[in-house]
Amino acid sequence: MQNSQDYFYAQNRCQQQQAPSTLRTVTMAEFRRVPLPPMAEVPMLSTQNSMGSSASASASSLEMWEKDLEERLNSIDHDMNNNKFGSGELKSMFNQGKVEEMDF
């Protein structure tokens, strides 16, 4: 007579033999690496700063970025003040407190 451990292994072998007939095949999608689209490099991470590891180089790059940002914000303010797309009227209505009179 076989011991219980041998019987357990015999059952497992039978299940393993039956398993391939009951399995389904699943097709998996294949993913490939693709290059990233070209993007503008952030001024703080530019190659010029990585070559010169001084803090002043990165600070000047940051200052240039902030100056450019300030110029763009000033340009937006200028456009708003010159009534581009009616925003000048909207701003004056808000400043005068005539929000209730506004017709949307």
From Swiss-Prot:
Superkingdom of source: Eukaryota
Localization: Nucleus; Cytoplasm
Major location category of this protein: nucleus
Region (Disordered): 43-62
Gene Ontology terms for molecular function: ribonucleoside-diphosphate reductase inhibitor activity
GO terms (BP aspect): DNA damage response; mitochondrion organization; negative regulation of DNA replication
Name of the protein in question: Ribonucleotide reductase inhibitor protein SML1
Organism for this UniProt entry: Saccharomyces cerevisiae (strain ATCC 204508 / S288c)
